[in-house]
From Swiss-Prot:
Marked site (Important for efficient shutoff activity and nuclear localization) residue numbers: R195, K198, R199
Pfam families per the UniProt record, alphabetical: Flu_PA
Catalytic residues, chain numbering: E80, D108
Protein name stated in the entry: Protein PA-X
Keywords: Decay of host mRNAs by virus, Eukaryotic host gene expression shutoff by virus, Host cytoplasm, Host gene expression shutoff by virus, Host mRNA suppression by virus, Host nucleus, Host-virus interaction
Location (main, coarse): host cell
Membrane-crossing residue ranges in chain numbering: none
Site-annotated residues for Important for efficient shutoff activity: K202, K203, K206
Domains: entry comment: The probable endonuclease active site in the N-terminus and the basic amino acid cluster in the C-terminus are important for the shutoff activity. The C-terminus acts as a nuclear localization signal. The C-terminus is recruited to host protein complexes involved in nuclear Pol II RNA processing.
Function: Plays a major role in the shutoff of the host protein expression by cleaving mRNAs probably via an endonuclease activity. This host shutoff allows the virus to escape from the host antiviral response. Hijacks host RNA splicing machinery to selectively target host RNAs containing introns for destruction. This may explain the preferential degradation of RNAs that have undergone co- or post-transcriptional processing.
Organism: Influenza A virus (strain A/Swine/Hong Kong/81/1978 H3N2)
Amino acid sequence: MEDFVRQCFNPMIVELAEKAMKEYGEDPKIETNKFAAICTHLEICFMYSDFHFIDERGESIIVESGDPNALLKHRFEIIEGRDRTMAWTVVNSICNTTGVEKPKLLPDLYDYKENRFIEIGVTRREVHIYYLEKANKIKSEKTHIHIFSFTGEEMATKADYTLDEESRARIKTRLFTIRQEMASRGLWDSFVSPREAKRQLKKDLKSQEPCAGLPTKVSHRTSPALKTLEPMWMDSNRTAALRASFLKCQKK
């Protein structure tokens, strides 16, 4: 699984996931399923944000190519992927600026158009079950929840899906691609089932051979959002990073 993750995801996402796990004392080489899950969640958060801007009239627009107008502002502030200290600094700054209620737990994004924090969920189970778990954990009606599954299902607070249908379709396609690529390498069952994961881990520890069939090249294309993980007060420099690129596993 570790080899698959390093081949399938952009190196910057992998690096952020490794830092996040090490911050909590977890080892990506051992807890490989969690490693894959964190990388997936990070990428979906970035895809959620990519190409969405607010114009001078306060309207939400999508810009997919070329350099956006200097008057445009990123619609979403990315909180996920930052270290905890910086993440809370960003959250506090948003709350002080907008007057929104400070969340008890770190959210993933902030939507400047709807003026709300967003919690993104990616699940291998039923979306409604995961949604309820998220809602029970957050315990706040102020934070908007949006859940995606690897089977193309989604669920959001009050059925408000925030993004346009095409943007959400890209996310669903990416998740389906990840699932198919895992399945083709015999990794999906262990990713879904904890019992199977333990069996797979024992098998991996016995074998030091590289995973057969993995692509030998890594895509170094970078999502626009990956280039914008600086403090929000540097927002004026963010627009230059816009490049149309969505990450996909390379074909075998």
